[in-house]
Amino acid sequence: MKFEPIAIVGQGCVLPGGLSPDELWKTAHEGRDVLGSPPPDYWGVSAAQIVRDEKNAPFFDHTWSDRGGYVRGFDEIFDPRRFLLDADELHGLDPLYLWAVEAARQALESAGWRPGEVPGSAGVVLGNLSYPTKSMTDLAENVWRGSEHGIDWRNRFMSGLPAHVMSNALGLTAGATALDAACASSLYAIKLACDRLHDRTADVMVAGGVNGASDLLLHVGFSALQALSRTGKSRPFHSGADGLVPAEGAAFLVLRRLDDAVADNNTILGVIRAVGLSNDGRGHGLLVPSQEGQERAMRLAYEMAELEPQDISLIECHATGTSRGDLTELMSMARIFHGMVNIPIGSLKSNLGHSITASGAAGAIKVLAAMRAGVRPPTLHVDDPLPFIADSPFRLLTEAEPWVCSGPRRAAINNFGFGGNNAHLLLEEWVEPADKHHSRPNFPVTSAQPDDDIAIVGISLLVGDDETASVADHLKICQPIPSCDGSGTRRARMTEVWLDVTQTRFPPVDLKQTLPQQLALLGAALNIDELIKGLPPDTTSVVVGMGCDAEVTRLGVRWRLADEIDDPDQLAAARDGVVQGWTAAGVVGAMPNIVANRLNRQFDLRGPSFTVSREQLSGTTALEMAARALRRGEVDAAVVGAVDLSCEQVHEAAARVLLGSEEQIPGDAAVVLVLKRADDARRDGDTVLATLPADQEPHGECLHLGTAPGALNLSPLLGHAHAASGLLYVAAGVLYGLLGVWPDGTPWTSEKRAVVIALNALAGQEQQIVLVPPAPKPYDADALGGQFRPAARPQTGKSTRLHFPGHLPDVRLPTHVVGAHSSVSHQEEQPASAAELGMVSAGQPIATIHYRHQSRRTPKDS
């Protein structure tokens, strides 16, 4: 597939040493090192309690260094009156939100547009590290301490909501979503934004990344992985480099189709020629980079751009300062650039550390400035480079030099992330043709979105303690899954997750340290493992809707107790009452992108893979992205999932304030669908469970499901599993079509049928999905059971099942550190109503909805 070039017409950033692109270029060009220690109380616990630089320091509950790349001076340059939202609406939000909206505002204004003035349809794709922010940790701690007064509950939804706030603050109305592909996130975001432009579903896209995750969590986590620099120095490609140094901030680009940018006389900062994406699949492990995976991303980029590696005259490397990672990158590049010499390489991380989900976009801004200045800037701390470089095609830029080359300046930018996520972006300077009408390069132009129907050929559900066939039974007889617990609250709670040890490729000891969120999705996928194992490994993607797991905030609370309890034994006991210490396996088991990438390793799937966060629309947006990639021919199959275990104290507290009444019935769910192009599914002899028509226009007799007005809200039946809720509606629509029944249990036998899923989400986001069920057949319980129930495993006389709790034990804080407001009512403590915050997502209960021409019966309460 050829890549239609995309123009970069705007840029903005909020980064260490770079509160604007000009300031960032000055930092890079002048060779400044802007790393340092955090401001006082930045971590919520004194550094003396956490920093241990001794060689024998334990790997958990401590960090080897507090040095990082910190955003400084932001309050002096941020003006909340510059946005379409009232300044009060931005008050109380975590800095993550504010960095993102400010960097994106800069980018739009550099393109010549103020908020609300962007031409055509404009959207957002945001790379966002879905670890908790400090504000989310504060929120969770207050919930557990029973002191909820004054909480800004929006900080609970820090995975997808920042993109929604960006769209509202800037007047971008063509959809806003976030994703997590670890360190490759911002280049993944740029690629997916280009896809929107290519298929003409948007005219302008704002794309990039932000990292506002808890800096304490990153430092302790990277120490547990033995990846943090003990010296606090970021030294890419140095022979003595001892690890990475985390950084925070945001960086964004404004993108348009090149033809549109030229026609409108936009200032073109550069041109994206291609972005190649891949995953390592099984590779060497979730944390170990793979040459083969990195090479696939690079080769794909050059193939799509119709360029050769020798066209590149600068490489902005991923190079984080980890010896294995840097060497692997050099080795994979050496294969691609074999036979060439003297290729300049560098890394912005030597200046400001590793900004993780923002790093690729930050590198792109650096390269754009270098092209404009005609200067290749230096990389710091490379006085003793890795020996491999001496006989490689590459040379390190130790000082600034003129960027002279025979043709247009072209650069490659690498991003490689945990979980095997790889990205390679090709960037070209824009040279204005002497005659705009006759001297334009002959670039490929992609047509609007191809018209392939997409087939759903596999489905697996876990809802509470029910699996697919049981969920189908509940839908058929209108029997709710949520039931009342001892507190009188109705929940669809998952009490346990079980995995078959003969199926999993992960050591049981590691799985025991993995959060139930990851285990639930893995369990759902393993229930249809034979189907997934038959998919083409090189061209199958994994795209999963999810949100930040609030359980991860327990770690921050665990570490903060060190400032409250002096006695070591009492401190150890108190900490264990919150959560166990973080080991390397525990870090991986809580890593947000691993929710998707664990399936890459399990099934050796090597297509582009990532998690998607759009709050209630997370799973359906994952579905939409996978369908787009299938229609474009970039992949041949996709495993699409969504997971959320919402029966959890912190989420429930936030839901009571910000979500509608139906969405306050918490549910736990994991959903997995398998997609192919419909023609391929028929060729392969797959059973087509439903199709996603290309035109997405409903025809025939329609069943309306969802949370939009006029649709049937299934939360009373299935519970509300927040980030999984949208895809759960899709799965329910598939099941209703296969069962041949309406939700009231009456037969649905029309030849032309459709399911319309209409969804509303936080901050006004909306989405509609249309499904076409197969021709109706008589309901056959045995046939459906055989299709939906996992195949029986051979009996060996010994159980091969591993059982894991569906939730962590309740948080137990010592009485002397529990807040004085532990009995405060949730209702009394709401700082503002959901309506006042503009956050309520609409929806109506089953009893009041006419989801077809005539509603006959409604589910019974239980």
Give the location of each predicted region.
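Polybasic, low-complexity intrinsically disordered segments
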Residues: 818-827, 854, 858
